[in-house]
Amino acid sequence: SLSVAFESVIATYNTNVGCGDVVAINANTGTYKATRSAINSFNTVPISSNSAVGTLSRDRLELWRSDLVRTIEYGHVEAPQEADQQPHPDCALTSALTRMELLAITDLCPDSITDGVALRFMSTTPEDSRQPEIKQSIDLEPHSTLVSIGQTAAAVYTPTTPAGTARITSFNQQGKELNAATVPSSPLLDGTAPTHHEDRTGVTTPQIADLPHHMSWFDGQRLYLFEPENLLISHIFEGALGTGIAVGGQLLYPNREGIAVADWNTGKILRVIPVDRQGYDGPVSLNQAGHTIIEQRDDTYVALN
């Protein structure tokens, strides 16, 4: 897998003991910055923030600092050095997000009475990286999954009845419910989008992006903006194709016609910049390199001048 953090490209390679060989390459010079090698799961996805990078799989999670030294591991440990250091080694992880010193995960445990999911908050840097320090655990309904995280809170998506609806609920790290809203069901999370949210790893990887004054999440058809402190939904942009970027104090995000320019304070779309994608109608996400806007269309990157 590949991820970007600490001004480096982090590449994780599969070996005969899992995806445990990791190389950090300086993005500016192309030189090696750090390496690590350890036992890991075979099917992993990257997880990262401005403060940490790591891998997530169905059975374990790891985070590393900029020199690739591990700061925390959670879940199944192949050869534990000491007994009883992991609080839930037999649980299956379903999603995870991290920001600053906060790590939030959802997992499903075989002894769950309600067959539900648990949301767990913990520090990214416990005193012993082998022994996670869980701050709070919250029982959730089945199929709940993380969609956003702030410095002190996280938001989860839960399918509800009737069909076609869902609920997004935010909790702080003390376990208090902050906000809840009924929303349309997510095509990515209910499996009706072209690219389902779960790949061969079996974990959910939400499509998120940071903006100057909001966190954002793309649900497969809509772009959600969350307030950073309490993760209250401030705006929902229908017809989006993916996550957007901030340019000149405004939100730019992809839609069918091109790139929509929106006011993130009011939620009003100001104009749409036409883009000819030459028949491509799949997901699109925006990035920026200098003054150039980059569209990622599946595995293809297109520079727009």
Where are the regions a protein language model picked out?
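Generic low-polarity alpha-helical segments
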Residues: S1, V9, G30, L68, ...
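Long, acidic/polar, low-complexity amphipathic helices and coiled-coil-like
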Residues: L2-S123, E127-S129
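Structural motif
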Residues: V17-A24, R58-R65, L108-M122, T161-S170, ...
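C-terminal closing repeat unit and adjoining cap/tail of repeat-based domains
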Residues: D219-I233, A246-N305
